[in-house]
Protein backbone atom coordinates (compact mmCIF):
# COMPACT_ATOMS: atom_id res chain seq x y z
CA UNK A 1 0.00 0.00 0.00
CA UNK A 2 1.34 3.43 -0.91
CA UNK A 3 1.49 6.06 1.85
CA UNK A 4 -1.16 8.75 1.55
CA UNK A 5 -0.65 12.40 2.32
CA UNK A 6 -3.31 13.48 4.79
CA UNK A 7 -4.69 16.76 6.03
CA UNK A 8 -4.98 17.16 9.82
CA UNK A 9 -8.82 16.79 10.05
CA UNK A 10 -8.84 13.66 7.88
CA UNK A 11 -5.88 12.22 9.81
CA UNK A 12 -7.78 12.70 13.08
CA UNK A 13 -10.88 10.94 11.75
CA UNK A 14 -8.91 8.01 10.33
CA UNK A 15 -6.80 7.46 13.44
CA UNK A 16 -9.89 7.62 15.62
CA UNK A 17 -11.70 5.16 13.38
CA UNK A 18 -8.85 2.67 13.53
CA UNK A 19 -8.74 2.82 17.31
CA UNK A 20 -12.48 2.27 17.69
CA UNK A 21 -12.56 -0.75 15.37
CA UNK A 22 -9.64 -2.67 16.85
CA UNK A 23 -9.42 -4.35 20.23
CA UNK A 24 -5.68 -4.87 19.82
CA UNK A 25 -3.44 -2.24 21.48
CA UNK A 26 -1.89 -1.23 18.15
CA UNK A 27 -1.73 2.43 17.18
CA UNK A 28 -1.21 3.53 13.60
CA UNK A 29 2.23 5.00 13.11
CA UNK A 30 2.14 8.71 12.26
CA UNK A 31 5.12 10.04 10.33
CA UNK A 32 5.71 13.79 10.12
CA UNK A 33 8.09 15.18 7.53
CA UNK A 34 8.79 18.54 6.01
CA UNK A 35 6.44 17.77 3.15
CA UNK A 36 3.44 16.80 5.25
CA UNK A 37 1.92 14.19 7.56
CA UNK A 38 1.70 10.54 6.57
CA UNK A 39 -0.14 7.56 8.02
CA UNK A 40 1.71 4.26 7.65
CA UNK A 41 -0.38 1.22 6.65
CA UNK A 42 -1.31 -0.83 9.73
CA UNK A 43 -3.27 -4.05 9.66
CA UNK A 44 -6.51 -3.63 11.66
CA UNK A 45 -8.73 -6.49 12.78
CA UNK A 46 -12.48 -6.74 12.96
CA UNK A 47 -13.68 -6.50 16.57
CA UNK A 48 -13.79 -9.76 18.50
CA UNK A 49 -17.20 -10.88 19.75
CA UNK A 50 -18.08 -9.08 22.99
CA UNK A 51 -18.69 -12.38 24.77
CA UNK A 52 -15.47 -14.41 24.87
CA UNK A 53 -16.73 -16.85 27.52
CA UNK A 54 -16.55 -19.75 25.03
CA UNK A 55 -12.88 -19.06 24.26
CA UNK A 56 -10.33 -21.40 25.85
CA UNK A 57 -6.74 -20.09 25.51
CA UNK A 58 -3.96 -22.36 24.30
CA UNK A 59 -0.94 -22.48 26.60
CA UNK A 60 2.42 -20.95 25.75
CA UNK A 61 4.90 -23.80 25.30
CA UNK A 62 8.04 -23.64 27.43
CA UNK A 63 11.61 -23.70 26.16
CA UNK A 64 13.79 -26.55 27.48
CA UNK A 65 15.90 -24.72 30.04
CA UNK A 66 18.36 -26.77 32.06
CA UNK A 67 16.37 -26.18 35.26
CA UNK A 68 13.15 -27.45 33.64
CA UNK A 69 14.86 -30.61 32.42
CA UNK A 70 16.37 -31.20 35.87
CA UNK A 71 12.91 -30.81 37.44
CA UNK A 72 11.50 -33.40 35.05
CA UNK A 73 14.27 -35.86 35.96
CA UNK A 74 13.72 -35.30 39.68
CA UNK A 75 9.98 -35.88 39.31
CA UNK A 76 10.56 -39.21 37.55
CA UNK A 77 8.56 -38.10 34.50
CA UNK A 78 11.65 -37.89 32.26
CA UNK A 79 12.05 -41.68 32.36
CA UNK A 80 8.47 -42.21 31.17
CA UNK A 81 7.21 -42.10 27.58
CA UNK A 82 7.42 -38.89 25.56
CA UNK A 83 6.93 -38.09 21.89
CA UNK A 84 8.61 -35.53 19.64
CA UNK A 85 6.45 -34.15 16.81
CA UNK A 86 7.26 -31.58 14.17
CA UNK A 87 6.68 -27.97 15.19
CA UNK A 88 4.91 -26.43 12.22
CA UNK A 89 5.62 -22.78 11.46
CA UNK A 90 2.25 -21.09 11.04
CA UNK A 91 -0.29 -19.38 13.27
CA UNK A 92 -2.23 -20.81 16.22
CA UNK A 93 -5.77 -21.74 15.23
CA UNK A 94 -8.68 -23.37 17.05
CA UNK A 95 -11.84 -25.06 15.75
CA UNK A 96 -14.71 -24.99 18.27
CA UNK A 97 -17.98 -26.89 18.49
CA UNK A 98 -20.18 -25.23 21.12
CA UNK A 99 -23.40 -26.79 22.39
CA UNK A 100 -26.01 -24.07 22.89
CA UNK A 101 -28.83 -26.30 24.10
CA UNK A 102 -31.04 -26.83 21.09
CA UNK A 103 -28.23 -26.57 18.54
CA UNK A 104 -24.44 -26.65 18.08
CA UNK A 105 -22.38 -23.77 16.75
CA UNK A 106 -19.00 -23.98 15.01
CA UNK A 107 -16.65 -21.08 15.73
CA UNK A 108 -13.01 -20.34 14.92
CA UNK A 109 -10.33 -18.80 17.11
CA UNK A 110 -6.88 -17.27 16.82
CA UNK A 111 -4.55 -17.16 19.80
CA UNK A 112 -6.25 -14.11 21.35
CA UNK A 113 -9.89 -15.12 21.03
CA UNK A 114 -12.84 -16.32 18.97
CA UNK A 115 -13.02 -14.35 15.74
CA UNK A 116 -15.73 -12.28 14.18
CA UNK A 117 -16.96 -14.27 11.13
CA UNK A 118 -15.92 -11.44 8.80
CA UNK A 119 -12.34 -11.16 10.02
CA UNK A 120 -9.92 -12.06 7.24
CA UNK A 121 -7.50 -14.20 9.20
CA UNK A 122 -5.02 -15.60 6.67
CA UNK A 123 -7.76 -16.92 4.39
CA UNK A 124 -9.06 -19.64 6.73
CA UNK A 125 -12.59 -19.26 5.31
CA UNK A 126 -11.53 -21.36 2.32
CA UNK A 127 -11.33 -24.37 4.68
CA UNK A 128 -14.51 -23.74 6.71
CA UNK A 129 -16.58 -26.51 5.08
CA UNK A 130 -13.84 -29.06 5.77
CA UNK A 131 -13.32 -27.79 9.33
CA UNK A 132 -17.05 -27.94 10.08
CA UNK A 133 -17.36 -31.53 8.87
CA UNK A 134 -14.23 -32.60 10.77
CA UNK A 135 -15.21 -31.11 14.14
CA UNK A 136 -18.69 -32.66 13.91
CA UNK A 137 -17.24 -36.09 13.08
CA UNK A 138 -14.81 -35.72 15.99
CA UNK A 139 -17.71 -34.85 18.29
CA UNK A 140 -19.62 -37.98 17.23
CA UNK A 141 -16.52 -40.15 17.77
CA UNK A 142 -16.02 -38.77 21.29
CA UNK A 143 -19.64 -39.33 22.27
CA UNK A 144 -19.58 -42.85 20.89
CA UNK A 145 -16.28 -43.77 22.57
CA UNK A 146 -17.13 -42.39 26.02
CA UNK A 147 -20.89 -42.95 26.00
CA UNK A 148 -21.75 -39.24 26.18
CA UNK A 149 -25.15 -37.82 25.30
CA UNK A 150 -23.71 -34.34 24.75
CA UNK A 151 -20.44 -32.41 24.74
CA UNK A 152 -20.68 -28.82 25.95
CA UNK A 153 -17.51 -27.60 24.24
CA UNK A 154 -15.07 -29.35 21.94
CA UNK A 155 -11.83 -27.71 20.78
CA UNK A 156 -9.45 -28.93 18.09
CA UNK A 157 -6.25 -26.90 18.38
CA UNK A 158 -3.62 -26.71 15.69
CA UNK A 159 -1.65 -24.56 13.30
CA UNK A 160 -2.89 -22.80 10.17
CA UNK A 161 0.02 -22.92 7.71
CA UNK A 162 1.11 -22.91 4.09
CA UNK A 163 0.25 -20.54 1.20
CA UNK A 164 3.96 -20.33 0.35
CA UNK A 165 6.19 -22.64 -1.70
CA UNK A 166 8.76 -20.92 -3.88
CA UNK A 167 9.72 -23.63 -6.34
CA UNK A 168 10.05 -22.84 -10.09
CA UNK A 169 7.90 -25.84 -11.06
CA UNK A 170 5.17 -25.34 -8.44
CA UNK A 171 2.56 -22.69 -9.34
CA UNK A 172 1.02 -20.36 -6.78
CA UNK A 173 -2.47 -21.07 -5.50
CA UNK A 174 -5.29 -19.92 -7.74
CA UNK A 175 -7.90 -20.17 -4.99
CA UNK A 176 -9.79 -17.23 -3.50
CA UNK A 177 -11.14 -16.85 0.01
CA UNK A 178 -14.65 -15.36 0.28
CA UNK A 179 -15.81 -13.81 3.57
CA UNK A 180 -19.47 -13.87 4.67
CA UNK A 181 -19.71 -10.17 3.81
CA UNK A 182 -18.73 -10.93 0.22
CA UNK A 183 -15.15 -9.64 0.29
CA UNK A 184 -12.65 -11.81 -1.56
CA UNK A 185 -8.92 -12.39 -1.06
CA UNK A 186 -6.45 -14.53 -3.07
CA UNK A 187 -4.72 -17.33 -1.15
CA UNK A 188 -1.56 -16.49 -3.12
CA UNK A 189 -1.52 -13.15 -1.28
CA UNK A 190 -1.66 -14.71 2.20
CA UNK A 191 1.56 -14.32 4.18
CA UNK A 192 1.50 -16.34 7.39
CA UNK A 193 5.30 -16.46 7.57
CA UNK A 194 8.02 -14.11 6.35
CA UNK A 195 11.00 -16.39 6.92
CA UNK A 196 12.50 -18.19 3.86
CA UNK A 197 12.07 -21.59 5.57
CA UNK A 198 10.32 -23.81 6.32
CA UNK A 199 7.94 -23.79 3.36
CA UNK A 200 5.21 -26.38 2.99
CA UNK A 201 2.72 -25.80 0.16
CA UNK A 202 1.24 -23.07 -2.06
CA UNK A 203 -2.17 -23.98 -0.59
CA UNK A 204 -3.50 -23.29 2.90
CA UNK A 205 -3.56 -26.20 5.37
CA UNK A 206 -4.32 -27.05 9.00
CA UNK A 207 -2.12 -29.19 11.27
CA UNK A 208 -3.91 -30.50 14.39
CA UNK A 209 -1.96 -31.15 17.59
CA UNK A 210 -4.44 -31.20 20.52
CA UNK A 211 -8.02 -32.18 21.33
CA UNK A 212 -9.85 -31.17 24.49
CA UNK A 213 -13.50 -31.32 25.51
CA UNK A 214 -15.78 -30.28 28.35
CA UNK A 215 -19.00 -32.23 28.90
CA UNK A 216 -20.54 -29.39 30.91
CA UNK A 217 -18.98 -26.70 28.75
CA UNK A 218 -17.26 -25.15 31.78
CA UNK A 219 -13.56 -24.27 31.50
CA UNK A 220 -12.66 -26.13 34.69
CA UNK A 221 -14.18 -29.36 33.31
CA UNK A 222 -11.99 -29.54 30.19
CA UNK A 223 -10.30 -32.89 29.55
CA UNK A 224 -7.16 -32.87 27.38
CA UNK A 225 -6.69 -36.10 25.44
CA UNK A 226 -3.36 -37.88 25.90
CA UNK A 227 -1.24 -38.38 22.81
CA UNK A 228 -2.40 -41.93 22.05
CA UNK A 229 -6.07 -40.96 22.36
CA UNK A 230 -5.40 -37.89 20.22
CA UNK A 231 -3.94 -40.10 17.47
CA UNK A 232 -6.77 -42.64 17.80
CA UNK A 233 -9.43 -39.99 17.16
CA UNK A 234 -7.49 -37.89 14.64
CA UNK A 235 -6.76 -40.91 12.45
CA UNK A 236 -10.51 -41.49 12.07
CA UNK A 237 -11.32 -37.95 10.91
CA UNK A 238 -11.20 -37.74 7.08
CA UNK A 239 -8.44 -35.57 5.57
CA UNK A 240 -7.19 -34.35 8.96
CA UNK A 241 -3.44 -33.71 9.01
CA UNK A 242 -2.23 -34.22 12.57
CA UNK A 243 0.95 -34.41 14.65
CA UNK A 244 2.61 -37.81 14.46
CA UNK A 245 5.55 -38.97 16.51
CA UNK A 246 8.98 -38.55 14.95
CA UNK A 247 10.50 -40.08 18.08
CA UNK A 248 8.89 -41.98 20.94
CA UNK A 249 10.89 -42.80 24.06
CA UNK A 250 12.27 -41.18 27.18
CA UNK A 251 12.62 -37.42 27.44
CA UNK A 252 16.37 -37.74 26.77
CA UNK A 253 15.78 -39.80 23.63
CA UNK A 254 13.45 -37.07 22.36
CA UNK A 255 15.90 -34.30 23.29
CA UNK A 256 18.64 -36.19 21.43
CA UNK A 257 16.71 -35.76 18.18
CA UNK A 258 18.86 -33.92 15.63
CA UNK A 259 16.74 -30.78 15.38
CA UNK A 260 19.61 -28.88 13.71
CA UNK A 261 19.44 -30.96 10.50
CA UNK A 262 15.75 -31.91 10.39
CA UNK A 263 14.20 -31.22 6.98
CA UNK A 264 10.42 -30.87 7.14
CA UNK A 265 8.66 -33.92 5.64
CA UNK A 266 5.36 -32.04 5.25
CA UNK A 267 5.79 -31.00 1.57
CA UNK A 268 6.12 -34.70 0.64
CA UNK A 269 3.01 -35.52 2.67
CA UNK A 270 1.19 -32.76 0.81
CA UNK A 271 2.14 -34.12 -2.62
CA UNK A 272 5.27 -32.09 -3.33
CA UNK A 273 7.84 -34.83 -2.76
CA UNK A 274 9.23 -34.45 -6.27
CA UNK A 275 9.76 -30.71 -5.83
CA UNK A 276 12.02 -30.38 -2.77
CA UNK A 277 13.41 -27.05 -1.64
CA UNK A 278 17.08 -26.93 -0.73
CA UNK A 279 17.70 -26.17 2.94
CA UNK A 280 14.01 -26.51 3.85
CA UNK A 281 14.68 -27.09 7.54
CA UNK A 282 11.79 -27.61 9.94
CA UNK A 283 11.26 -24.95 12.59
CA UNK A 284 11.86 -27.58 15.24
CA UNK A 285 9.94 -30.11 17.32
CA UNK A 286 7.47 -30.13 20.18
CA UNK A 287 8.18 -32.72 22.87
CA UNK A 288 5.30 -33.81 25.08
CA UNK A 289 4.58 -36.45 27.70
CA UNK A 290 2.27 -39.04 26.15
CA UNK A 291 -0.14 -38.61 29.08
CA UNK A 292 0.02 -34.82 29.26
CA UNK A 293 -3.18 -33.58 30.88
CA UNK A 294 -3.56 -36.67 33.09
CA UNK A 295 -3.90 -35.48 36.73
CA UNK A 296 -1.40 -38.16 37.80
CA UNK A 297 1.18 -36.53 35.50
CA UNK A 298 0.26 -32.89 36.02
CA UNK A 299 0.34 -33.17 39.84
CA UNK A 300 4.14 -32.82 39.69
CA UNK A 301 3.68 -29.19 38.60
CA UNK A 302 6.44 -29.31 35.98
CA UNK A 303 6.39 -28.67 32.23
CA UNK A 304 4.99 -31.64 30.33
CA UNK A 305 5.35 -30.00 26.92
CA UNK A 306 8.41 -28.15 25.58
CA UNK A 307 9.55 -26.84 22.21
CA UNK A 308 12.92 -27.04 20.48
CA UNK A 309 13.81 -24.79 17.58
CA UNK A 310 16.81 -25.22 15.33
CA UNK A 311 19.39 -22.46 15.69
CA UNK A 312 19.15 -21.51 11.99
CA UNK A 313 15.45 -20.74 12.39
CA UNK A 314 16.04 -18.88 15.65
CA UNK A 315 18.58 -16.67 13.92
CA UNK A 316 15.98 -15.75 11.28
CA UNK A 317 13.13 -15.26 13.73
CA UNK A 318 15.12 -13.60 16.49
CA UNK A 319 18.42 -12.20 15.13
CA UNK A 320 21.19 -12.42 17.71
CA UNK A 321 19.54 -15.28 19.59
CA UNK A 322 21.58 -18.06 17.96
CA UNK A 323 24.43 -17.73 20.46
CA UNK A 324 21.98 -17.65 23.35
CA UNK A 325 20.27 -20.80 22.04
CA UNK A 326 23.62 -22.57 21.74
CA UNK A 327 24.58 -21.67 25.30
CA UNK A 328 21.20 -22.44 26.86
CA UNK A 329 20.22 -25.55 24.92
CA UNK A 330 22.72 -27.06 22.48
CA UNK A 331 25.71 -26.93 24.86
CA UNK A 332 23.66 -27.83 27.96
CA UNK A 333 20.30 -29.55 27.64
CA UNK A 334 20.90 -31.43 24.39
CA UNK A 335 24.51 -32.35 25.11
CA UNK A 336 23.39 -33.71 28.50
CA UNK A 337 20.66 -35.76 26.84
CA UNK A 338 23.15 -37.14 24.29
CA UNK A 339 25.49 -38.21 27.09
CA UNK A 340 22.65 -39.99 28.87
CA UNK A 341 21.63 -41.87 25.71
CA UNK A 342 25.32 -42.60 24.96
CA UNK A 343 25.47 -40.43 21.88
CA UNK A 344 22.74 -42.24 19.98
CA UNK A 345 20.83 -39.73 17.86
CA UNK A 346 17.35 -41.17 17.49
CA UNK A 347 16.31 -42.19 13.99
CA UNK A 348 13.11 -40.66 12.62
CA UNK A 349 10.26 -43.17 12.54
CA UNK A 350 8.33 -43.61 9.33
CA UNK A 351 5.14 -42.09 10.78
CA UNK A 352 5.72 -38.78 8.97
CA UNK A 353 6.53 -40.37 5.61
CA UNK A 354 4.08 -40.93 2.75
CA UNK A 355 2.92 -44.52 2.16
CA UNK A 356 5.49 -45.54 -0.49
CA UNK A 357 8.38 -44.05 1.47
CA UNK A 358 7.18 -45.62 4.73
CA UNK A 359 7.00 -49.07 3.14
CA UNK A 360 10.47 -48.62 1.62
CA UNK A 361 11.90 -47.54 4.95
CA UNK A 362 10.46 -50.63 6.68
CA UNK A 363 11.77 -52.94 3.96
CA UNK A 364 15.27 -51.51 4.16
CA UNK A 365 15.50 -51.69 7.95
CA UNK A 366 14.25 -55.29 7.87
CA UNK A 367 17.39 -56.08 5.85
CA UNK A 368 19.50 -55.19 8.89
CA UNK A 369 19.32 -58.50 10.76
CA UNK A 370 21.34 -60.92 12.89
CA UNK A 371 21.68 -63.26 9.91
CA UNK A 372 23.10 -60.54 7.67
CA UNK A 373 25.54 -59.50 10.40
CA UNK A 374 26.78 -63.11 10.63
CA UNK A 375 27.32 -63.18 6.86
CA UNK A 376 29.30 -59.93 6.99
CA UNK A 377 31.49 -61.24 9.82
CA UNK A 378 32.17 -64.49 7.95
CA UNK A 379 33.50 -62.46 5.01
CA UNK A 380 35.87 -60.56 7.32
CA UNK A 381 37.30 -63.54 9.16
CA UNK A 382 38.28 -63.93 12.78
CA UNK A 383 41.85 -62.61 12.82
CA UNK A 384 41.14 -59.07 11.49
CA UNK A 385 38.40 -58.67 14.10
CA UNK A 386 40.46 -59.84 17.06
CA UNK A 387 43.58 -57.93 16.00
CA UNK A 388 41.59 -54.70 15.57
CA UNK A 389 42.48 -54.45 11.89
CA UNK A 390 38.72 -54.26 11.24
CA UNK A 391 37.01 -52.01 13.78
CA UNK A 392 33.44 -51.83 15.05
CA UNK A 393 32.85 -48.78 12.83
CA UNK A 394 34.08 -50.76 9.81
CA UNK A 395 31.60 -53.54 10.56
CA UNK A 396 28.75 -51.02 10.85
CA UNK A 397 29.56 -49.58 7.41
CA UNK A 398 29.90 -53.03 5.83
CA UNK A 399 26.56 -54.15 7.29
CA UNK A 400 24.79 -50.98 6.12
CA UNK A 401 26.23 -51.31 2.58
CA UNK A 402 25.30 -54.98 2.39
CA UNK A 403 21.72 -54.28 3.51
CA UNK A 404 21.41 -51.40 1.06
CA UNK A 405 22.80 -53.48 -1.82
CA UNK A 406 20.19 -56.23 -1.42
CA UNK A 407 17.44 -53.68 -0.81
CA UNK A 408 18.16 -52.03 -4.17
CA UNK A 409 17.94 -55.42 -5.90
CA UNK A 410 14.42 -56.13 -4.65
CA UNK A 411 12.87 -52.69 -4.27
CA UNK A 412 10.11 -51.40 -6.54
CA UNK A 413 11.06 -48.79 -9.14
CA UNK A 414 8.68 -46.36 -7.41
CA UNK A 415 11.19 -46.04 -4.58
CA UNK A 416 14.03 -45.29 -6.98
CA UNK A 417 11.97 -42.34 -8.24
CA UNK A 418 11.41 -40.79 -4.82
CA UNK A 419 13.07 -37.51 -3.89
CA UNK A 420 16.79 -37.17 -3.36
CA UNK A 421 16.09 -35.99 0.19
CA UNK A 422 14.22 -39.22 0.95
CA UNK A 423 16.92 -41.41 -0.57
CA UNK A 424 19.46 -39.65 1.65
CA UNK A 425 17.17 -40.32 4.61
CA UNK A 426 17.13 -44.04 3.74
CA UNK A 427 20.93 -44.15 3.80
CA UNK A 428 20.98 -42.36 7.16
CA UNK A 429 18.39 -44.71 8.62
CA UNK A 430 20.11 -47.91 7.47
CA UNK A 431 23.41 -46.66 8.92
CA UNK A 432 21.90 -45.93 12.35
CA UNK A 433 20.00 -49.22 12.39
CA UNK A 434 23.24 -51.08 11.55
CA UNK A 435 25.06 -49.11 14.25
CA UNK A 436 22.40 -50.03 16.80
CA UNK A 437 22.59 -53.76 15.99
CA UNK A 438 26.40 -53.94 15.94
CA UNK A 439 26.74 -52.05 19.23
CA UNK A 440 24.17 -54.34 20.81
CA UNK A 441 25.96 -57.51 19.67
CA UNK A 442 29.62 -56.42 19.67
CA UNK A 443 30.74 -57.63 23.10
CA UNK A 444 29.06 -61.00 22.65
CA UNK A 445 30.50 -61.40 19.14
CA UNK A 446 34.05 -60.65 20.22
CA UNK A 447 33.80 -63.14 23.09
CA UNK A 448 32.52 -65.81 20.71
CA UNK A 449 35.30 -65.13 18.22
CA UNK A 450 37.96 -65.25 20.93
CA UNK A 451 36.56 -68.52 22.30
CA UNK A 452 36.42 -70.03 18.81
CA UNK A 453 40.03 -69.03 18.16
CA UNK A 454 41.27 -70.61 21.39
CA UNK A 455 39.50 -73.86 20.50
CA UNK A 456 41.05 -73.84 17.03
CA UNK A 457 44.63 -73.57 18.35
CA UNK A 458 45.98 -77.11 18.98
CA UNK A 459 47.50 -77.72 22.43
CA UNK A 460 51.29 -77.63 22.61
CA UNK A 461 52.99 -81.08 22.43
CA UNK A 462 54.86 -82.11 25.59
CA UNK A 463 58.55 -81.28 25.38
CA UNK A 464 60.85 -84.23 24.53
CA UNK A 465 62.92 -85.39 27.53
CA UNK A 466 66.54 -84.37 27.44
CA UNK A 467 69.39 -86.79 27.90
CA UNK A 468 70.05 -87.71 31.46
CA UNK A 469 66.40 -87.43 32.52
Swiss-Prot record:
It catalyses: ATP + (ribonucleotide)n-3'-hydroxyl + 5'-phospho-(ribonucleotide)m = (ribonucleotide)n+m + AMP + diphosphate. The keyword Ribonucleoprotein does not apply. This is RNA-editing ligase 1, mitochondrial. It is found in: Mitochondrion. It holds the Pfam family RNA_ligase. Residues 1-44 form a transit peptide. Its EC number is 6.5.1.3. SUPFAM superfamilies: DNA ligase/mRNA capping enzyme, catalytic domain. GO terms for molecular function: ATP binding; RNA binding; RNA ligase (ATP) activity. Its main location: mitochondrion. One of its GO terms (cellular component) is kinetoplast. Residues 450-469 are annotated as: Disordered. One of its GO terms (biological process) is mRNA processing. The keyword Transit peptide applies. It is an enzyme of class 6 (ligase). Coiled coil: none annotated. InterPro entries: RNA_lig_RNL2, RNA_ligase_dom_REL/Rnl2, Rnl1/2_C_sf. Keywords: ATP-binding, Ligase, Mitochondrion, mRNA processing, Nucleotide-binding, RNA-binding, Transit peptide.
